[in-house]
From Swiss-Prot:
Positions with biased composition (Basic and acidic residues): 743-759
UniProt-listed PANTHER family: BINDING PROTEIN TRANSPEPTIDASE, PUTATIVE-RELATED (PTHR32282), PENICILLIN-BINDING PROTEIN 1B (PTHR32282:SF11)
Region (Transpeptidase): 378-663
Biological function: Cell wall formation. Synthesis of cross-linked peptidoglycan from the lipid intermediates. The enzyme has a penicillin-insensitive transglycosylase N-terminal domain (formation of linear glycan strands) and a penicillin-sensitive transpeptidase C-terminal domain (cross-linking of the peptide subunits).
Ranges annotated as biased composition (Polar residues): 808-820
UniProt-recorded name of the protein: Penicillin-binding protein 1A
Transmembrane segments: 31-51
Taxonomic lineage from the root: Bacteria, Bacillati, Bacillota, Clostridia, Eubacteriales
Length: 820
C-alpha cells in the first residue's frame, strides 16, 4: 500500500469516528433550531405587523355601510318629494326582493362561488393566490393578485380605497370577517349589488339595468343577468355600448357565456336554461336598449345647483374631502329640504318656454340646434331676499338633456347696464359723492377724463346722442353710458370692484377697468369666466329692499343625515352689509322710475311697487333685467348659447317676462312698500348745476329748474348755483325772445334768494354715518382724487354752454325712450 493510500484511509477513519459524527449531529441540531427560531421570529414580526395593520384599520360602522342602501332625497319647500339625488356617479337603490335570483346567482357564481360557505374570507382561494403572488415576486413581475370575496369587495367599496397593497388587503380581510358577524349573507349581497361599480358613472345593478337595457332590475332576463354579472370584473372591456365592442362583440359575449357556464356548473340553472341561453347569444347576440335619460332629475335646473351648494357647505363645515362628500351625497341617505316653490318653478318654466315672449327677437323662437335644444335661450331666478331662500331657478328653455349647463347658476356672462346700480350709483351715494338729485353731464369725455378712464376713443350712449345735465335719477333711468363712466370714475375702479365682489360679481384679470365697472362689459375669457348670472343678480338686487344687507342666497333650508341629525341649517341667514340703509332706499327709489315711466313699464304688475334695471351687452348679444319688490328680487337673462346680435331692446323683451313671473310669485300678496329709513331728506337742487338753487333757478325760460330729490342727511350740496345768474337768465330770455317770465319773476330778477327745503319732504333729520368708511373694508375712497364732481355737482358749470339746446342736449324732464 502506498503512502498516499495509507493517508487517505486514515482520514476516512477519522471522519467516520464517533467524535466527528457527534459534531455533525450537533451542527444539524443547532441549524434546525436556528431555522426554527428564525421562523418563529419571522412569524412574530409578521404577526405584530399584521396586528398593527388591523389596529390601524378604520372602525367598522355597520350602519354606515347599510346606509349605502338609502338614497339621498330632495324635498320641496312644503316637504314633498322632489328628487332622488343623482350625482355624476349614478346609483339607484333597490331592495333584495326586487333583485332577480338569477342576478344574485350570476354574481355569486363568477365572483365568489363559496360565498354562502365562508365567513368573509375564502381560505382556499387565498392559498392559491399567495402561491401565485410568490411566483410573481420570484419572476420579477411584482403582480399582486386578489382573492376578494363579495364581502371583501363591499368593504373595499364602502370603507377602503382602491389601493393595491398588502396592507389594504389585510385590513379588507379583517373588516370582512367583522362584517359577517353583524349582517346576514343576503344583507351583504344586496348592499354589494347596490354599490358595485358597473362602468362609466353607473354604480349598482339598478343603474346598470337602466343604462344597458332601459329596464327595472326586476325585469331582467337570464342573459341580461349573466351579462351584468360578468361586467363588473372589467367594466370598460366588457361594455357592450362602446364603439370598439360594437365592432367586435366577442369579448363581452364570451364573458357572458362564461358566467352562464359557471351558473350551470354550480347547479344554479338547468341544462335546458343554459343551452337555450347559449343558442340565443349565438343567434342574436345580446340586445341592448340604452337609456340616454338615465341621469336626468325631475327638477333638473334646481336640483343640481342644490347638490353643488350642499356639497360645498358640507366641505366648509366638516372639512370633508371632495371624495368623502361625493360618497356622502350619493350614498349617505341624506334628506335635503330645498327652498323651491314647486308651483312657481313649474310656472316660471312655462313662461320662459312660451315662444310668444320672444317674437320681438326672432320669428322662429323655437328653432333648435343639432342637439334638439332651442337656440334662443333664457334663464330666471326668484329669491326671497330677506331669508336668502331661492324660490325658483330655471336654467334654460325647453326640454334639454341631463347635465345640460345651467344658465341661471353656473354660466357667467357680461351683465351690461344692470351693473350701474350695483357698482356706480350705489357706491357713489354710499361714499357721500352725491344723492339722487346730484347732476352729471351726459357729454363727451374731456381729454382729462379720457386719460383717467383709460379710453382711447370716445365712448357712446346707446341712444347715440348727448343729453347734457342729468340727475343721478334720470341718468340711471335712461341708462346714460357717459354719465355712468363719469360717476364711476369718481367712485374709483377699486371701490366699484370691491362693492361688486361683495355683491357676488366675478372680476377676471382682464375685467378690472372702468368699462367693466361702469358698463358691465366683462371679458368672459373661457379660461377665466367672469361676470354674473340671474342667480347672482337676483341676490345682489335684493340689497336695495333689505337695508343694504345682502343675504347669501341658499337653495336649501336644512340637510339631515340618515338618522335625522341636522347637518346643515340655513334658518339663520348669512348676511353681509353692503350699503347703508339710506343708500339702499335711495337707489331703490331711483330704480322705480325705469318701471313707472321708463323703458321697463311692462315689468309692472298689479299694485305692487317694482324697481329694476335693464341690461344690454355689447352688440345686443345678451338682454337682462334685474329688479325687486318689497317681497322678492328676481333676474331674467335672454340670449343665444352661441352669441348673436338680437334685433330689439332689452326692456321690450325682458321686462314683460319679469312682470309675468313676478306676478306669479306675488299671487295673493297684499300691497306694501319698502320701509323708508331715517336719515334721508328730499333736498332742493338746481337740475342744471346740481347745487343749492337760488330764485334765479326758477326764472329759467324753460321753466323752473328747481328739483327735489333724496339725499342722505349731510351729503347734499352746500354751495349755491353759479349757473343761473342775472346775465345768464337775461341772455336766455333775449336769445329765445322769451316772454314767459311773469311779473313776479321780473320783480325778483335782481335777487338770488335761497330756495328753502320742502319741510313735507324731509324725513327724520338724524344724520347717518355718511363717511366713506361705509365703503368695503381696506378700499381707497377714490382712485382718481378729482376735486370736481364731488357732492351734489358732478359737472363743472363753467364747462357748459349757455345755449345747451344748440348742442343736441335735451333737458332732463323731457320724455326719453332709451334702449338700455
Amino acid at each position: 500500500m502506498t503512502e498516499r493510500k495509507r493517508e487517505y484511509k486514515d482520514r476516512k477513519q477519522k471522519k467516520n469516528s464517533p467524535k466527528n459524527q457527534s459534531k455533525v449531529t450537533k451542527f444539524l441540531k443547532w441549524f434546525f433550531i436556528g431555522v426554527l427560531l428564525l421562523g418563529i421570529t419571522a412569524i412574530t414580526i409578521v404577526g405584530f405587523y399584521v396586528l398593527s395593520i388591523i389596529r390601524s384599520s378604520p372602525e367598522l360602522d355597520v350602519q354606515a355601510i347599510q346606509s349605502l342602501n338609502q338614497p339621498s332625497i330632495l324635498y320641496d319647500d312644503q316637504g314633498n318629494f322632489m328628487d332622488n339625488v343623482i350625482t355624476r356617479e349614478q346609483r339607484y337603490v333597490v331592495k333584495s326582493d326586487e333583485i332577480p335570483d338569477n342576478l344574485k346567482k350570476a354574481f355569486v357564481a363568477i365572483e365568489d362561488e363559496r360565498f354562502y360557505e365562508h365567513k368573509g374570507i375564502d381560505i382556499k382561494r387565498i392559498a392559491g393566490v399567495i402561491a401565485s403572488n410568490i411566483k410573481g415576486k420570484l419572476s420579477g413581475s411584482n403582480t399582486v393578485q386578489g382573492a376578494s370575496t363579495i364581502t371583501q369587495q363591499l368593504i373595499k367599496n364602502a370603507v377602503l380605497t382602491n389601493e393595491v397593497s398588502y396592507e389594504r388587503k389585510i385590513k379588507e380581510m379583517y373588516l370582512a370577517l367583522e362584517l359577517e358577524k353583524h349582517l346576514s349573507k343576503d344583507e351583504i349581497l344586496t348592499t354589494y349589488l347596490n354599490t358595485i361599480p358597473m362602468g362609466g358613472y353607473q354604480y349598482g345593478v339598478s343603474a346598470a339595468a337602466q343604462r344597458f337595457f332601459s329596464k327595472n332590475v326586476s325585469d331582467l332576463n337570464l342573459i341580461e343577468c349573466a351579462y351584468l354579472g360578468g361586467l363588473t370584473q372589467a367594466p370598460t372591456s366588457y361594455d357592450g355600448l362602446s364603439e370598439i365592442n360594437k365592432e367586435n362583440p366577442s369579448r363581452y359575449l364570451n364573458r357572458t357565456k362564461s358566467v352562464l357556464f359557471k351558473m350551470h356548473e354550480l347547479g344554479y340553472i338547468s341544462s335546458e336554461q343554459y343551452n337555450n341561453a347559449i343558442n340565443e347569444i349565438d343567434t342574436n347576440g345580446i340586445k341592448f336598449k340604452p337609456n340616454n335619460k338615465l341621469s336626468k332629475t325631475n327638477f333638473e335646473w334646481f336640483t343640481r345647483p342644490t347638490i353643488t351648494q350642499v356639497k360645498q357647505d358640507l366641505m366648509n363645515k366638516y372639512k370633508y374631502t371632495q371624495d368623502e362628500v361625493d360618497k356622502l351625497i350619493a350614498n349617505g341617505g341624506l334628506k335635503i329640504y330645498t327652498s323651491m316653490d314647486r308651483n312657481l318653478q313649474n310656472n316660471v318654466q312655462k313662461v320662459l318656454d312660451d315662444p310668444n315672449n320672444y317674437k320681438a327677437i326672432t320669428n322662429n323662437p323655437n328653432e333648435k340646434n343639432e342637439d334638439d335644444v332651442y337656440k334662443l335661450q333664457a334663464s330666471a331666478t326668484i329669491i326671497d331676499y330677506k331669508t336668502g331662500h331661492v324660490k325658483a331657478l330655471v336654467g334654460g328653455r325647453g326640454e334639454q338633456p341631463a347635465m345640460s349647463h345651467n344658465r341661471a347658476y353656473y354660466d357667467l356672462k357680461s351683465i351690461g347696464s344692470a351693473t350701474k346700480p350695483l357698482t356706480v350709483y350705489g357706491p357713489a351715494i354710499d361714499l357721500g359723492l352725491g344723492g339722487a338729485g346730484s347732476v352729471v353731464n351726459d357729454s363727451p369725455l374731456t381729454n382729462k377724463e379720457l386719460s383717467s378712464t383709460g379710453y382711447k376713443d370716445q365712448p357712446k350712449n346707446e341712444y347715440n346722442s348727448y343729453r347734457g345735465p342729468l340727475t343721478f335719477r334720470e341718468a340711471i333711468k335712461i341708462s346714460s353710458n357717459l354719465a355712468a363712466i363719469k360717476v364711476a370714475n369718481e367712485v374709483g375702479v377699486s371701490n366699484s370692484i370691491a362693492y361688486g365682489e361683495k355683491l357676488g360679481l366675478v372680476y377676471g384679470p382682464h375685467s378690472r377697468g372702468i368699462s367693466t365697472t361702469a358698463l358691465g362689459q366683462f371679458q368672459n375669457d373661457p379660461n377665466n369666466p367672469d361676470g354674473g348670472n340671474t342667480y347672482t343678480l337676483a341676490s345682489a338686487f335684493g340689497v336695495f329692499g333689505n337695508n343694504g344687507v345682502k343675504t347669501n342666497a341658499k337653495l336649501y333650508t336644512k340637510v339631515l343625515d340618515s338618522h335625522g341629525n341636522v347637518l346643515l341649517d340655513t334658518s339663520t341667514p348669512e348676511e353681509i352689509k353692503i350699503f347703508s340703509p339710506q343708500t339702499s332706499y335711495i337707489v331703490y327709489d331711483m330704480l322705480k322710475d325705469q318701471v313707472e315711466s321708463g323703458s321697463a313699464k311692462p315689468a309692472k304688475f298689479g299694485n305692487i311697487p317694482v324697481a329694476g334695471k335693464t341690461g344690454t351687452t355689447t352688440g345686443d348679444k345678451d338682454y337682462l333685467f334685474a329688479g325687486l319688490t318689497p317681497y322678492y328680487s328676481a333676474a331674467i337673462w335672454i340670449g343665444y348659447d352661441k352669441p348673436r346680435e338680437m334685433r330689439t331692446s332689452s326692456g321690450i323683451v325682458t321686462s314683460p317676462i319679469f312682470g309675468k313671473i313676478m306676478g306669479l310669485a306675488h299671487k295673493g300678496l297684499q300691497y306694501k312698500e319698502v320701509e323708508q329709513p331715517s336719515g334721508i331728506s328730499k333736498i332742493a337742487v338746481c337740475m342744471d348745476s346740481g347745487l343749492k338753487p337760488t330764485s334765479l333757478c326758477t326764472q329759467d325760460p324753460r321753466g323752473s329748474r328747481v328739483y327735489y330729490d333724496w339725499f342722505i342727511n349731510g351729503s347734499a350740496p352746500n354751495q349755491y348755483c353759479n349757473y343761473h345768474t342775472n346775465s345768464h337768465v337775461n341772455n336766455f330770455n333775449k336769445n329765445n325772445n322769451t316772454t314767459g317770465v311773469n311779473e313776479k319773476n321780473k320783480k325778483q330778477e335782481t335777487k338770488t334768494e335761497e330756495i328753502k327745503p320742502n319741510e313735507n319732504n324731509k324725513s327724520n333729520e338724524q344724520t347717518p354715518n355718511t363717511n366713506p368708511d361705509n365703503a368695503p373694508n381696506n378700499v381707497p375712497n377714490n382712485d382718481n382724487n378729482n376735486s370736481n364732481n364731488i357732492g351734489g355737482n358732478m359737472i363743472p358749470p363753467q364747462n357748459q354752454t349757455e345755449n345747451n339746446t344748440n348742442n343736441g342736449v335735451i333737458t332732463p324732464n323731457q320724455s326719453i325712450n332709451n334702449k338700455n
